[in-house]
């Protein structure tokens, strides 16, 4: 349905939400909303009214501000934030918006990778800030002490089974001990009781703080902002250095709650922008699936990754869900183009000319310039998108709590890490085609005729030519850190293949971070994707301490295996050498894929 039919359907959807009191159910935590918002029978809806509850308490928010001041008074100037998914993506948003730079305060370094290169990059940044040259040979006690005496690592896990922060903390503790620094004074853990990370903290006697200020456990990781310490502590670290007055977090959350206006969503849902958005997504969806192409105002693009995690991890289940992309131009004459489940959303801050190609989401509060206003705007945006997500789940009867599919690859990775080399697990894979300096592992039903590039291109062509299965989008995933230049080069080629040659949107992801944010959807959400995962056979060695690429390799293999088991069209491309050495090989591969498709389209 489109045009006038869409308007009628959208109106009917808003009427349904009002008559069934969907927002009221969410707030009361009852009815179908309680069922959809529960994981293993346990309610995970503390986030719904969390912002209303916190300012009502006289001390909780001020305690977080005092924690921030105490970190400064203790001499901490650099804070490595180690976590995955919802435990860190909010911090990445705040970092990109300028709240973690450490200008006159504590610098925050997000760490969500098992690639030694990510640790090396943080070490280099801290050393550079101190004008401390890295030694070319073995590090000395004095060097490590100077480097780390004002550094703290915060290990965060809002799930029970995340192990990456444990590997980061283990690496850091080893270096602190070599430096003669007491680890307990430079560690902080925030996690759920009984989690893997909690067990680690207890064994190491590391200081810990509850994620929810009220010590509750009813907030899923992707709902961590703005009601848990994942948002509140970085915000407090920034605010208390700008101005030492108390009550700043209270003011930010109160303003965000005012912007959000959940009372309006309850009493008049047809007037609330995020309820309207949920209805529009539902109207655009086909068989429970919707592709959302999102255009943010200047300066706010950092929110897209957060929104993608929220939507895809929450709703990507049973072949349904919302898949989120940056706005990108699709060639309507391309053989794979279709638009009947796409919603182009343009977020605006004020009056703008009508554009029929976009659904317009008006958020005037994004125009604020002062730090308090911008933090409130970020928080209000988080709340609004969470509401849209829950209502879409309600309309399609999707359980939006939990992310069961990803436990498959986590268990596999755990086993693969015990091997001398996790790639041993795929060395005898039959659906393998080798080229010069690269090897492509394919699903078993793929015909292996020609080069790796031609094999991959033929699968894409088959999707758009036989008409039996639609191609909804392409995913490209780097396993491990990659240079900006290589990322941009690959992204340009990938967009050309998807947008121009085939007429479909594309994703460019970096793992393992994105395995904790959008892999749930790729494994169990809308099945109409083709995914290409890339792993270099060699990676940087750790500059300091002991940290190998074994976990990274295990994650690359385990996620691919899990996708294959799930029946998804997923390829693993192994490239000889390091990411830098393999950049040209990868570019050539993608150019050959593009050329093969163009020949087929002629």
Residue ranges and their predicted role:
Residues 475-505, 510-512, 518, 524, ...:
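Extended C-terminal subregions enriched in glycine
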Residues 81, 153-155, 189, 293-294, ...:
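Structural beta-sheet core signal
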Residues 73-266, 343, 350:
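Glycine-rich phosphate-binding loops that contact phosphosugars or nucleotide phosphates
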